[in-house]
Amino acid sequence: MKRTHYCGELTRELVGKKVVLKGWADNRRDHGKLIFIDMRDNSGLVQVVCDFESNPEALEVADSVRSEYVLEITGTVRERSPENVNPDLKTGEIEVDCEDINVLNTSKTPPFFINENVDVDENIRLKYRYLDLRRPSMQNNIYLRHKITKLVRDFLDENGFIEVETPMLTKSTPEGARDFLVPSRLHEGSFYALPQSPQLFKQLLMASGVEKYFQIARCFRDEDLRADRQPEFSQIDIEMSFFEQEEFMKLMENMVSKLFKEVLGIELTKPFPRITYQEAMDRYGSDSPDLRYGLELHDVSDLVKDAEFKVFRETVASEGQVKGIAVPQGQEFSRKEIDDLTEFVKEFGAKGLAWMVLEEEEIKSPIAKFFSDEELDGIIDRMGANTGDLLLFVADEPEIVADSLSKLREHLANKLDLIPSNEYQLTWVIDFPLMEYDKDEGRYKALHHPFTSPYEDDLEKYENEPEKIRAKAYDLVLNGVEIGGGSMRIHQKELQEKMFEFLGIPLEEAKQKFGFLFEAFEYGTPPHGGIAFGLDRLVMLFTGSQSIRDVIAFPKTANASCLMTEAPAKVDENQLKELHLKTTK
């Protein structure tokens, strides 16, 4: 029979109406001549009552039903008695009087209950992902992912963008993460690479006259995994020709605002704040700052460069930094808690943590005696500190100071419960450095990628201050998480060649990897740029999920394996032979 309603749709307005439901047996309770079945589909759950007095045949079938049996039930909606109303259930005011029950499929006893209140090891959930996805929270995540994707498509379509698919089998051009390689059977010894992003193809689409492009792109990176990374992921990829950076950022603000309004019912204030990369690093120690709370970093290097405290003085003399955080009313921290904070920053390379407590009559600190009153007053004033505050300092190389204090800032905000719930702070971080120096490789590397356009007025700094060349790059940050990153692109062959020269990549090597792009630039490629939003991360933030694996239907584990399909797996020797490959293990 044709399904007439979904379980979660049944309300008091349908009392007396005959319905046909299809779904799973969530739970079964036997009360002798009455059997109750909680029936579930992706809309919700409803209670079905099988009564021996009115329908002994249906009761006999119901007696055989177990959890996760697939059922078709015909019955009449009726009101529950007042004492049996379940206020915690959307359909809690009604139930279905079963007239006919048909078992469409049986089920083995599941390895875990399909229930939100049951704590299940994640590896078990991933092994039986098809069961895990039946849970309402996972159904909600998958639905919201679909809704977000549809809203993005609709918005971009309304603004003149067209969706274009780019190749999945392409050329390996490693400059960053490792590529996933695919051997070619027809071209012995040659390999395709799965795309890390559609970067080159979307630029070629701009050269092709496709002025407004987008794609929900699948991307692949063979890198060491972290909690918020997957070897394969999706991004909302957008590129546009003939526009100014500010114009494009405003368009993206409108798109993100639409998502917040339609998905969360939240009206965002526009325009979003702008903060330069340098300001973000100076104030927060991070290029993805969380602006929902204070605890800003303060540079006191100039105030302590002549202090008697040797650690601070020598750090500044060796071109290091001394920065601190003022913790409001931190005088309540015990010495053990401060020692724990010291151990915490050591995890990020800091050698230690100096501290001062501002008491009513004095400064309590093992290092206070090494500073003059003038130096102490300067530190307190610079940090905006008040009586009762705890001042925490790290003295080290600028990179270590930034990393350790940004992590400490976040740690303290959580410890002190300073992060407001249900608040969303979006900001653009702009004017990134074009390059950063890689000590291991002994050369400069692109901070984003080598196709990012520099501010042309900054190019004169290449000889003496290459790290000060700014990029026309912009990241969108939400609550301390980068959700999108983009830039204006280089569209002229000469500037692109110069960029590779800056990066220490020989021109011949660059042409061997990217010659097709250089050639396209010789045929009138327009000015263009774009952005990519991490779809998985965006859905994770919208749903409040703790793991990115909870917003992907079939994710990989931390070691890039699939517990359900047991991928990756060894393949047949004949397959390897056809590909002209041999394995060493």
Curated annotation (Swiss-Prot):
Cellular component terms per the entry's GO annotation: cytoplasm
Signal peptide: none
PROSITE patterns for the chain: AA_TRNA_LIGASE_II
Primary residence: cytoplasm
Binding site for ATP: R221, D222, E223, Q230, E482, G534, L535, D536, R537
A Gene Ontology molecular function term of the record: aspartate-tRNA ligase activity
Gene Ontology annotations of biological process type: aspartyl-tRNA aminoacylation
Stretches for region Aspartate: 199-202
Documented EC number(s): 6.1.1.23
Keyword Hydrolase: no
UniProtKB keywords: Aminoacyl-tRNA synthetase, ATP-binding, Cytoplasm, Ligase, Nucleotide-binding, Protein biosynthesis
Subcellular compartments: Cytoplasm
Pfam families found in the cross-reference section: GAD (PF02938), tRNA-synt_2 (PF00152), tRNA_anti-codon (PF01336)
Residues the record marks as site: Important for tRNA non-discrimination: H31
Similarity comment: Belongs to the class-II aminoacyl-tRNA synthetase family. Type 1 subfamily.
Complexes and interactors: Homodimer.
UniProt xrefs under PANTHER family: ASPARTATE--TRNA LIGASE, MITOCHONDRIAL (PTHR22594:SF5), ASPARTYL/LYSYL-TRNA SYNTHETASE (PTHR22594)
HAMAP family: Asp_tRNA_synth_type1
The protein's name: Aspartate--tRNA(Asp/Asn) ligase
Protein species of origin: Natranaerobius thermophilus (strain ATCC BAA-1301 / DSM 18059 / JW/NM-WN-LF)
